[in-house]
Amino acid sequence: MKIIVAGGTGFLGKKIVSSLADKGHNVCVLTRNLHKHKKTFSNNVKVIDWSTINPSLLSDTNILIKLNGEKVDQLWTKSVKSKILNSRIDSTKMLFDFCVKNEIIPQKFINASAVGIYAKESANYNFSVDENSELGNTFLAKVCLENERSTDIFKVFEDIDIIQLRIGVVL
C-alpha cells in the first residue's frame, strides 16, 4: 500500500513510519524540515518537503495519515493556544486542497486526535470510554473536537473511510 504520513517525524510518527516500512508498505513522510529529517528513516521511506511536494510522488495513495500539530506540552499562552488549534485545522485543509488539486483520492484518512476530547470525569481508570462517551469542555477537548470536525471536508470523496485516532498520553 502507498501511505502518506504528515507528522511522521515526531515521536509517535517515527515509530509508525518505521513499522509500516518494515512491513513492506510504500511510505512517504511530509515534513517542514527536509534537511533535518532526510536521514531519519531507512532508504525505503521517502521524505518530502511540504512546500515542494511533487504530486506524481503521491499519486495512487491508499492511506493518508495526519499526525502533525503544534506540541501541547508547553506553556499555554494565548499565542501558543492559537498555534495548537490552528496547526491541526490548517494542515487538514492543506492536505485536502492538495488532494483535490492533484486528484489524489485516498481510501482512508487517519487523523490523530486524543483522548483529551472526553469529559474529565472519564479520566477515572475504572471508567471506560468509547466514541459515544461524553465530550469535555476543556481547551484540549475543544481542540480535539475542532480537529476532528475539520476532517469532514474529506467526505466529498465517496467511499473514503475517515478514522479519528484518539491517542492517549504518549511518554
Please annotate each region the language model reported:
Residues 2, 62-63, 108:
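Structural motif
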Residues 3-23:
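N-terminal Rossmann NAD(P)H-binding glycine-rich loop of SDR-like oxidoreductase domains
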Residues 6, 30, 67-68, 109-115, ...:
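SDR active-site strand-loop-helix element
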Residues 30-35, 51:
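N-terminal Rossmann-fold cofactor-binding loop
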